[in-house]
A protein has these predicted regions:
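A short, acidic, flexible beta-alpha connecting loop/helix-capping segment that sits on the rim
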Residues: 79, 159-162, 186-188
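A short C-terminal boundary segment appended to hydrolase-like catalytic domains
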Residues: 172-189
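Extended active-site neighborhood of metal-dependent phosphoesterases/phosphodiesterases
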Residues: 1-56, 60, 137, 141-172
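Short, surface-exposed linear patches
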Residues: 43-44, 99-100, 106, 148-152, ...
Length: 189
């Protein structure tokens, strides 16, 4: 299903589909999330577009989690381009901090929304992204008290110049963890 949060479908990147049924179902969601400071450094025309895009993304994510509940899914997979700055409040590169907004943090609201949705969701959440070109798999989100959100996993795929490696994601309904993450090395042909 494509997002219909606006009359002219200004955000065709926002898609959703479901694989499976009942407790084995997984809901897949894509959102329009550009890198480079969430598109805020892209010139006046694109910068004016950002509030509407960010609102559409938030609405679309809320709808996706509501849909996941309605179909009794076990997991939600969210795919986007940008690394939404998980490191800013995860403690991955320093001490764990309570998340707080700073003027230069273009992704703060998205991370808070993801933490809210994940903590209210009984299943697993997998966030897939690229952007910073290095493999990462961790649980970077923190709740409002600074505690890890344990059912939220982020996987960042390899990017240039690491073009000989890839990531395999296995989905195992009825098992814990629901998502298996395996790094792979391409074999020379």
């Amino acid at each position: 299903q494509q997002s219909s949060t606006d009359p002219v479908h200004a955000f065709p990147e926002n898609l959703r589909w479901t694989v499976g049924a009942g407790p084995g179902a997984v809901v897949f969601v894509t959102i329009n999330l550009p890198g480079s400071h969430n598109g805020r450094d892209s010139g006046a025309a694109l910068t004016q577009h950002n509030p509407a895009r960010e609102a559409a993304n938030a609405h679309w994510l809320r709808q996706a989690f509501a849909h996941a509940r309605a179909v009794s899914a076990s997991g939600v997979v969210i795919a986007a381009h940008a690394n939404p700055g998980f490191e800013a409040d995860s403690g991955l590169f320093g001490s764990v901090r309570t998340p707080r907004r700073t003027p230069e943090d273009a992704y703060y609201d998205l991370r808070r929304l993801l933490a809210e949705l994940a903590t209210q969701w009984p299943g697993e959440v997998l966030f897939l992204h690229g952007d910073t070109h290095r493999f990462q798999s961790n649980q970077p989100l923190r709740d409002a008290a600074g505690a890890p959100v344990k059912n939220f996993t982020r996987v960042e795929s390899y990017g240039w110049p690491v073009t000989s490696s890839w990531v395999r994601i296995d989905v195992s309904p009825g098992h814990t963890p629901l998502f298996g993450i395996v790094k792979r090395q391409a074999t020379p042909g």
